[in-house]
Regions:
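Extracellular glycan-modifying ectodomains
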Residues: 1-295
Length: 295
């Protein structure tokens, strides 16, 4: 029996290539001898990572270990998340980001994109949206020295290059100070909820209205606002019980995603794409908008 238990993880080894783990929302290491192996990677390290990622019952073992620590010690031992104060959950905190060459190169790329757009009479706007820790830094666990000074340095570089940009951080901090929950305490630990998105997107629309007066901010009455019960953390099987605000548009949208899906070249790991038409806004003369977004 012991031998059977010992060999079962090997018997259920995960051989599938290019698979994303549901427990920690990342792509598992591919076979270092296969066609999808990372070029130039250290073979020993790749083999070790491959076995650790693909061993049978990996997700179940991680979940069991996480739940045991939560119930016994109220500690979240999880690849993605950690507890803060007062019941808050955050993405696992890493070392503070240091402003460097990458950010300078990224700012210069944005300036080039803006120049490309403006040469074709197309307005350009870069939007920076804050992570949860930037709006609720006081809810991080003790011992965390949260420093996002790189953001100010990055925005200073954007100003030097003349990039048209807005930052929604202060807006959401002000909304929080006014008593509104613009990020959930637990669910979706890094991203704003629909209420936060409502305010952030309106700030974007107000900025764009300077180019196109026909663009108007949304109103709460434009949406059916309900609550959705979330029973696990996002991209995880960790159990929770939290309601989040859900905004559904009352105006029916035309969805053309499938019609154009094959025409849009995308990275294999980032396949997100959507094409939506709001007939009411089209009738009001609103322009088409192309949005590139990160997390």
């Amino acid at each position: 029996l012991f031998f059977v238990l010992l060999t079962m993880p090997l018997a259920f080894f995960n051989w599938e290539e290019n698979v994303v783990s549901e427990i920690d929302n990342r792509q598992l290491t591919n076979n270092p001898f296969g066609p999808n192996a990372e070029p130039g990677a250290d073979l020993t390290a790749s083999l070790e990572s491959y076995v650790q990622d693909r061993i049978g019952f990996r997700d179940e073992m991680i979940l069991g270990y996480t739940l045991l620590n939560d119930q016994l010690f109220h500690k979240m031992i999880h690849p993605l998340y950690e507890y803060g104060k007062d019941g808050y959950v955050f993405f696992k905190q890493k070392q503070n980001v240091q402003f460097g060459d990458y950010h300078i190169a990224f700012a210069e790329m944005l300036a080039e994109i803006q120049d490309y757009c403006q040469a074709r009479d197309v307005p350009f706007l870069f939007v920076l949206n804050p992570e949860k820790a930037a709006v609720y830094p006081d809810k991080l666990r003790d011992g965390i020295h949260y420093d996002r000074s790189w953001v100010q340095q990055f925005e200073q570089k954007l100003d030097e290059l003349g990039v048209n940009d807005i930052d929604n951080t202060q807006l959401l901090q002000d909304r929080r100070a006014g008593g509104e929950q613009v990020f959930n305490k637990v669910y979706n630990a890094g991203h704003w909820n629909d209420l936060g998105a409502f305010y952030g997107v309106n700030n974007i629309l107000e900025s764009l209205s300077g180019f196109f007066p026909s663009i108007q901010p949304n109103e709460l009455g434009d949406f059916a606002v309900t609550e959705t019960l979330q029973e696990t953390l996002l991209s995880s099987q960790f159990p929770i019980h939290e309601y989040e605000p859900t905004f559904g548009r009352l105006c029916e949208l035309e969805v053309k995603t499938e019609e154009y899906d094959a025409e849009v070249a995308r990275n294999s790991q980032h396949r997100g794409f959507g094409y939506f038409v709001n007939p009411e806004n089209v009738a009001a003369g609103a322009p088409k908008t192309l949005v590139f977004q990160g997390s």
